[in-house]
A protein has these predicted regions:
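Periplasmic/cell-envelope proteins involved in peptidoglycan metabolism and beta-lactam response
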Residues: 1-298, 320, 404-414, 545, ...
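Beta-lactam-recognizing serine transpeptidase/beta-lactamase-like catalytic domain environment
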Residues: 67, 221-226, 230-236, 274-326, ...
Length: 617
């Protein structure tokens, strides 16, 4: 009896639970269906037409307008309206429309098929206007407006595209393109067909430049046709324009830099030492930024992408090069700091017969530090490097030697080499390379390497790799007597707090600066020295396994109160004094004096073609 009693209670409890679960599931289904139908009903009743915000403008440091907006128009089609017309026996004249648009009937059919393919057009809805043809010109728009009434279901959507006042700065300014499915999933702000920054400043400052789109809420009838504004537009949301950006660029210098790179592969970076503001950042091959706007983008993007000279590579930020003899200045500073040498140290040099690293030419011997920089004496800097690393111990596997190498590496890194700055707004920065001791342990074994093994590092070859922007920044460190402000492109953002001190005492810079001044007055750069201007610089010629050596120069001017630090890299050009040096001097003259007086030199460098594969776009 007792068991039956408990059994009856158990059955009752299970029945109650079952009823509760059924009611719960029923309620969930009701809510789900209601919400789904409500959503469908709302989609049928309203069309939320986007009102695109004007993108922020971009200016150079002197207020010259670089990037602005121009009106463009998209031809939209609502598939349900076309379907209803066909059902009613009154389809539009597609042949006439094709004639107006300048497309074939097959192209018309292909576009319609693409619109209805949800795998490709993942935001497709027959009730929502879809993009049939984008980026119509004002002339096309005016022509269509006259005939659009003949084509129910087709409407015009206003928007803007970028345009450029100067045919330069493609790498640094960047471009905009249609957002991908992944971008839409990642950021709920975007809708299908929106544009966003793809690279450069356009990408870095996308959120500031894009503003906030608005929307116009329109009413539909039962056939999906637009009937007017919802509540007379009281619920519409107006767009908020994007924020304008004033860059640190000097467009006149940028133009000159790009002209001087014509017919060459390479880059030029100029920085204001006191502020870290980038004055110019040119990379070649390049292209007129207007070519990646509107319908031209689909034509030129694959051409640029498939060009063997890699125009999409910004060599200023992403090109990796051995710095060559320009590195000797940093080598001297670090070795002075660590006590491997003093300002009065002299080493003997036997010219091209010197071992294990030969000199490029005969000069006086023994040679002092200033003379070694002026003459670019390889043996001096090899012995400087060797003495610094081996001052506490010698031989493979010696821990004191490795400790000295680690300290040497850290001091080199403090000049902004070997890593990319995380506090910079420059797009596409690369690390470069200054090998760790542990990396050499893996390559040679823990007891398999010493200073002789890595001797090429002493003259900026071997495993030392830098980008041109890092090299220009290193010149700024020397100009500033031991610090740099992170290089940046937005002039309105004060980054003066982003000051980084090099691990070299102020007292060591004078002797190196003197040597760099001698390079430009009496040494490898003297032929192109500027009258009445003290320039401090260093030429470099770096070995290249794929052809002729690269030509490099870095420096700053004037010597007192420097206004510009610069680095020039010309690939496969030969000696640094032949090409990189005169190009740098012309850029310095342009920036400091706002004109170039050496017209013959400018024309010679501008018209000089060192690589016939480089195309002009």
């Amino acid at each position: 009896m007792l068991d039956d009693k408990y059994k009856d209670r158990s059955i009752a409890v299970h029945i109650v639970l079952a009823v509760i679960i059924i009611l719960f599931i029923g309620r969930l289904a009701q809510l789900q269906l209601y919400e789904d139908y409500t959503g469908v009903a709302e989609d049928n009743a309203f069309y939320r037409k986007p009102i695109y915000a004007p993108r922020g403008l971009i200016y150079d440091r002197n207020g010259k307008l670089l990037v602005y907006n121009q009106p463009t128009y998209d031809l939209m089609v609502t598939m349900k309206e076309l379907r209803d017309l066909s059902k009613a026996g009154t389809p539009i004249d597609t042949m006439e429309l094709c004639g107006l648009l300048g497309i074939t009937h097959q192209q018309f059919c292909d576009r319609m098929a693409y619109i209805k393919d949800r795998r490709k057009n993942y935001g497709y809805s027959q009730l929502t206007p879809q993009r049939f043809m984008t980026q119509l010109s004002p002339e096309d728009y005016a022509m269509l407006q006259e005939h659009l009434r003949k084509f129910p279901g087709f409407t015009i959507q206003n928007r803007t595209l970028r345009n450029y006042n100067y045919p330069c700065g493609a790498h640094v300014l960047g471009s905009i393109g249609e957002v991908s499915k992944r971008q839409i999933e990642r950021d709920s702000y975007y809708r299908l067909g929106d544009y966003a920054g793809s690279d450069g400043l356009e990408l870095t400052y996308e959120k500031e430049l894009r503003g906030e789109n608005g929307e116009e809420i329109l009413l539909r009838d039962s056939r999906g046709r637009i009937q007017g504004r919802y509540k007379d537009g009281s619920q519409d949301r107006m767009p908020t324009a994007g924020i304008d950006i004033t860059t640190t660029l000097d467009v006149d210098l940028q133009m000159i830099a790009e002209e001087l790179l014509h017919g060459k592969i390479g880059s030029i970076v100029a920085i204001e030492p006191a502020t870290g503001e980038i004055l110019a950042m040119a990379s070649n091959p390049t292209w007129n930024p207007s070519l990646l706007v509107g319908r031209l983008r689909s034509e030129y993007y694959p051409i640029l992408q498939n060009d063997s000279t890699k125009p999409f590579l910004n060599r200023a930020t992403g090109g990796l090069y051995s710095p060559g003899s320009t590195f000797k200045t940093l080598q001297a500073l670090v070795c002075l700091e660590q006590g491997g040498i003093t300002p009065h140290t002299k080493f003997a040099c036997s010219g091209p017969n010197t071992k294990p690293i030969k000199c490029t030419h005969h000069h006086g011997s023994p040679v002092s530090l200033e003379e070694a920089i002026q003459e670019s004496c390889n043996p001096f800097f090899w012995l400087t490097y060797k003495t610094t690393l081996e001052r506490d111990g010698y031989g493979e596997g010696n821990e004191k030697f490795k400790a000295n190498y680690r300290r040497w590496r850290e001091d080199i890194l403090s000049f902004g080499l070997g890593f990319k700055w995380t506090d910079s707004d420059v797009f596409g920065l690369k690390d470069g390379a200054i090998y760790r001791a542990e990396t050499y342990d893996k390559i040679y074994g823990k007891r398999g390497w010493k200073s002789l093994t890595i001797r090429s590092n002493s003259i900026g070859q071997g495993e030392v790799l830098v980008t041109p922007i890092q090299l220009a920044n290193a010149a700024a460190v020397i100009a500033n007597n031991g610090y740099y402000i992170t290089p940046h492109l937005n002039k309105c953002d004060s980054l003066l707090d982003n000051r980084h001190e090099a691990n070299v005492s102020r007292k060591h810079y004078d002797v190196v600066q003197e040597g760099m001044w001698r390079v430009c007055e009496y040494g490898t750069a003297h032929y192109y020295k500027l009258p009445n201007l003290a320039v401090c610089g260093k030429t470099g010629t770096t070995d290249n396994s794929h052809g002729k050596p690269h030509s490099i120069f870095f420096g700053y001017a004037p010597r007192e109160n420097p206004k510009i630090a610069i680095a020039v890299v010309i690939e496969n050009a030969g000696f640094g004094s032949q090409f990189a040096c005169p190009i740098a001097m012309l850029c310095i003259e342009q920036y400091l004096y706002r004109e170039i007086t050496q017209e013959a030199l400018f024309n010679r460098m501008k018209n000089l073609v060192l690589n016939s594969s480089v195309k002009t776009y």
